[in-house]
C-alpha cells in the first residue's frame, strides 16, 4: 500500500452488532463478543510503521438499520469515542481522525443531530482531529430503492440541509459512487463538490470497485 502512494487507512467501523474489533470495556458489558485479536491496536501499529494515518470508524449497533432512526447510535458511541481515545488515540500518533460510520442517503430521521453530536465529541476529545462521513446516493442501483431513485434536485436540496447542520463538526464527505449509473456521475458529483465548497467541507469520493450484479 505504501509503495503505491496510499497514505491513509480508514476502518469502516469498529464493530457491528455483537462483533467488535477491539476489547471495548463498554461494549463487552453490553454483550458483545471478545475479539480474538485487537485489530485496532494492530492497524494503528502498522499504520505508524509505514507512515500512514488511520481513521477510526465508530461502532454500529444495528439499531439504526432496524428502526430507521440514527439517534440510537449516539448513546453507544459516546462511550466508545471516549474509551478509544483514552486507550489508543493518546498512545498512537498514527491515529489521524474519525469516520462517523452511520450511512445515510437522504434526509434520514435523526441524521443531522446524530452526526453533529458525534462529530462534536470526536473533535473535543482529540483536540480537533478531522471527521468525515460517507453516505450513499439513493440512485437506481441502490438495493432498496431501484424503482424510486432520487433526482438530482432532490439530492441537492436534502444534502444542502444536512451540510448546513453538520459542517462545523464534520470536515469531509466521501459520497459512495456505486449506487448511480455511470452517466450520472458527473451530474451528482458536481452537486456534491458545489455543496461541499459552499460549507467549507472537503469533497472526497468513496470509489466502490466491486460488482453489483450478484445477489447479496
Task: Enumerate the language-model features and the residues they cover.
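Glycan-processing catalytic domains of CAZymes
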Residues: 1-216
Amino acid at each position: 500500500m505504501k509503495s503505491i502512494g496510499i497514505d491513509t487507512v480508514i476502518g469502516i467501523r469498529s464493530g457491528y452488532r455483537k462483533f467488535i474489533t477491539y476489547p471495548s470495556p463498554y461494549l463487552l458489558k453490553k454483550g458483545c463478543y471478545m475479539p480474538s485479536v485487537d485489530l485496532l491496536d494492530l492497524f494503528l501499529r502498522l499504520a505508524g510503521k509505514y507512515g500512514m494515518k488511520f481513521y477510526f470508524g465508530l461502532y454500529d449497533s444495528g439499531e439504526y438499520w432496524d428502526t430507521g432512526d440514527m439517534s440510537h447510535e449516539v448513546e453507544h458511541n459516546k462511550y466508545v469515542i471516549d474509551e478509544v481515545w483514552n486507550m489508543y488515540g493518546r498512545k498512537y500518533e498514527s491515529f489521524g481522525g474519525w469516520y462517523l460510520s452511520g450511512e445515510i442517503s437522504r434526509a434520514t430521521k435523526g441524521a443531522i443531530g446524530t452526526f453533529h453530536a458525534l462529530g462534536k465529541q470526536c473533535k473535543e476529545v482529540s483536540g480537533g482531529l478531522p471527521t468525515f462521513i460517507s453516505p450513499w446516493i439513493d440512485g437506481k442501483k441502490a438495493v432498496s430503492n431501484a424503482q424510486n431513485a432520487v433526482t438530482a434536485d432532490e439530492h441537492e436540496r436534502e444534502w444542502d440541509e444536512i451540510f448546513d447542520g453538520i459542517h462545523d463538526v464534520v470536515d469531509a464527505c466521501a459520497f459512495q459512487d456505486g449506487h448511480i449509473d455511470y452517466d450520472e456521475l458527473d451530474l451528482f458529483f458536481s452537486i456534491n463538490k458545489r455543496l461541499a465548497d459552499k460549507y467549507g467541507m472537503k469533497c472526497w469520493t468513496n470509489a466502490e470497485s466491486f460488482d453489483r450484479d450478484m445477489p447479496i
